[in-house]
A protein has these predicted regions:
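Conserved class I S-adenosyl-L-methionine
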Residues: 82-93
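N-terminal juxtadomain amphipathic helix
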Residues: 1-62
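Conserved alpha-helix/loop element of class I SAM-dependent methyltransferases that forms part
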Residues: 65-84
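Conserved SAM/SAH-binding beta-strand->alpha-helix loop
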Residues: 113-115
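Conserved SAM-binding strand-loop segment of SAM-dependent methyltransferases
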Residues: 122-138
Length: 142
């Protein structure tokens, strides 16, 4: 690996309440070039510092709702899914994409964000897994 440059010590995105101090220390973001030509971070910040508290909701923006609806339409036109097949939405957010998935499919949403999304996304899914996506977590949910 070859070091490209560092962006320095930066705070990872966090959505602070008024008069609240940052919950985490800054993290150095150093970029490396691997043998395949891919740019990578030297160290990944802890995931929960990036995704534990996340404010953006897909359903509040007409442009995003249209985009997500079009994604579902494109996929269902290509794949011709059968009854009870699984549709898994990784980073399901507030469940907006799942709201466009046909009801004859089993809809599973996975997202690590705090409880602020779960109530909304549960309206559109058969199951919401509030964690990071991995095979073990998925198997536990069956």
């Amino acid at each position: 690996m070859k070091e490209l440059f560092t962006l320095g010590d930066l705070y990872v995105s966090d959505f602070l309440k008024e008069d609240e101090s940052p919950r985490h220390l800054p993290t150095e973001l150093k970029l490396l070039l691997d043998d395949n030509g891919a740019v990578r971070l030297e160290k990944q910040p802890p995931l929960d510092t990036m995704w534990g508290r996340y404010w953006y909701r897909s359903g509040t923006n007409l442009t995003m709702r249209k985009e997500l609806s079009d994604i579902v339409s494109s996929i269902t036109n290509i794949l011709k899914l059968k009854d009870n097949e699984l549709w898994i939405d990784i980073a399901a957010n507030d469940g907006t994409l799942l709201s466009y998935v046909p009801s004859n499919l089993i809809k599973i949403g996975i997202d690590p964000a705090d409880d602020s999304f779960k109530k909304e996304s549960e309206k559109h899914a058969d199951l919401i897994i509030q964690n990071y996506f991995n095979a073990d977590e998925f198997k536990k949910s069956k």
